[in-house]
Amino acid sequence: MRKISPVKFPKTFVCAGAMMVALSTPQAAKADNLSDAMIGAYKTSGLLEQNRALLRATDESVAVAVARLRPIVDFAVTASHRYNRGPTTFGFSDTDTNTLEAGVSLEWLLYDGGASRLSQLAAQETVLSTRQSLLDIEQQVLFSAVQAYVNVLLQQDTVRLRSNNLRLLREELRAAQDRFEVGEVTRTDVALAESRVAGARANLTQSQGDLLEAKATYQQVVGSPINVVAGQPPLPQRVASLQAAESVAMRNHPSLLARQHAVKAAEHTAASTAKNLGPSLRLRADAGHSINLDGGRDSDTSGVSLVLSQRLYGGGSLAAARRADVARLDAEKGALISTQRSVSQAVAAAYVSLEAARASLVSSGEQVRAAQVAFDGIREEATLGARTTLDVLQAEQELLNAQTARVQARANQALAAYQLLQAQGLLTAEHLGLAVEIYDPTLYYNLVKDAPANVSQRSKDLDRVMKALGRN
């Protein structure tokens, strides 16, 4: 496995990170950031482990295809007892024969029109397709970590806003009660304030429950409980245009690359099946030694032969298999077209969502500023008797709504940014430069692609790799 050094963040985020470190407390230094979440998910994902094992199983199909082009050598030992009774001039004769035979046989496919070689190429393309599918799974796992992290951050911000809202409403309730005692407001004003406090308390309880649920989801995805959230994650570099994003996706998206390799594998498989209709040539050889256990003579046998065979009629099974493989090839080509369109649509949707989230964040920021000014003014006017309690409560609700919208827009922007990265096929541990040991699919493949025998040194190396993978 190769070690990938983490990439450098943009200068903006480096400066922000430096300020955070300078102003943070010792407890904040232990906060979990988005990279921690993705690293945890990458290291502990059972889904990734499952698909890595499936990839290793697919690697073995290449070894099986290679083995078809090699000679097959068998060794056999046979102990036999033969009884023979036959007529003679004077009656019947009984004969017992006991023998022990040992022999070696060899069979080697010399020619099959290239069918076995095409099967090997199909297996190699299937391996490449499965590797890309594994990368697609990796993207899904990492995006799940992004969603879990951003949701925890969103719920924490929501709890903070509603806690502050409850505090302000309690202050307003006390103010309404004081003004009621001096006759400035009626009991209705106090009841309105009490109702808003009760509603805010219920909303806060709901938000706290949502936060606990978000933390539980985070632990499920990342594999460890979250401590303190470090804050807003750095956003990926902004793409120049929708066309640029689509161009990157068409070159890099693993699901699209997987389909392309699947089409090539289907082409080789169809060609291999067509070759099976032709003749094949095999070399056969054997050597043996027979021991007569009854005291007779021992004997040695050996022989070699070339066998040219051609199936003349098989009930139509070979032709049916060829047509089926051609149909599967057509199906893979259709799936490739569908995948291309799906990738293009996903890029467009993510790009539009990101642009909308950015615009929404700007608008909600302006809304918060205006709502804060309005709330401060109305609250001050209420102390002078120019505004009612209901005016203050409505202004507070508008401020809370604006702040909540800004928090949601910020979360939507982060999710859309990483969703666009995923849609382009770039949400991988290697591209992000995560400080983890990147899983190298070629390590196992290079050990098995030549179908090593059990007694070879490569087979022993392979056993060590299998044990190491089993411990991970």
What are these regions (language model features)?
Residues 308, 325, 332, 354-357, ...:
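Hydrophobic, well-ordered secondary-structure elements that form the walls
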Residues 3-4, 83, 408-472:
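Acidic, low-complexity, intrinsically disordered peripheral segments
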Residues 20-28:
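C-terminal segment of classical bacterial N-terminal signal peptides
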Residues 2-16, 25:
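Bacterial N-terminal signal peptides that target proteins for export
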Residues 2-3, 7, 137-251, 262, ...:
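Periplasmic alpha-helical coiled-coil/stalk elements that build and connect Gram-negative outer-membrane
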Residues 33, 72-137, 257-269, 274-339, ...:
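Small/polar-residue-enriched beta-strand and adjacent coil segments characteristic
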Residues 121-124, 187-198, 323, 389-397:
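Short, charged, amphipathic alpha-helical segments
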